[in-house]
Amino acid sequence: MKPFLIAAAVGLFAAPVFADVNITADMPWVTVQTEDGEVEISRIDDPAHELSGEWARTSRNCPNFCVQPMVPAPGVTPIGELELLNMLQDPDAIVVDSRVAADHETGTIPGAISIPYNEATDRLDELGCELDFDGFDCEAAKPVALFCNGNWCGQSPTAARRMIEAGFPADKIHYYRGGMHAWRMLGLTVTGGR
């Protein structure tokens, strides 16, 4: 009996210990609606978890991967993860993954729709604008949050500028500059991808 107790005690101390890793002190998770049903967004419950591969890189060549401004165009509102989570739960808001399809397919934020930055001005109707004789009427535009790969990625800033040029109201655009890099760094849920 004694050897069993010793072995059990050693096993307990050798097992990994996972602490609660909440989003905030009073928010362990958030549930969002996606086209595939409800998805729970939470953080990876392992304080020892580390990023690897492409997401662990700290430097990229500039140009093309230059640090982006907090505000990509006048009137655009920069947001962080908590504001993005609020928008994901708001039925009137749309969260847009502005990355090219190949990037989107590696995984995305649950509840985001894919509108690549180079298609944004052709798809404003999906964001509450109506097609008219002169292009788009964006009087009824919905609040939109744009994101891409991270603070070194120019895809969502380019989408924001092009949308504004096409008539989308700048004050309806929110920019999550941290993008997938910050999202993954925080261990938040990612859907799709390989």
Q: At which residue positions do the language-model features occur?
A:
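Positively charged n-region of N-terminal signal peptides that target proteins for export
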Residues: 1-4
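Flexible, polar/low-complexity N-terminal or interdomain linker segments that lie immediately upstream
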Residues: 17-94, 101-106
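Catalytic cysteine-centered active loop of the rhodanese-like fold, especially the PTP/DSP P-loop
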Residues: 128-182
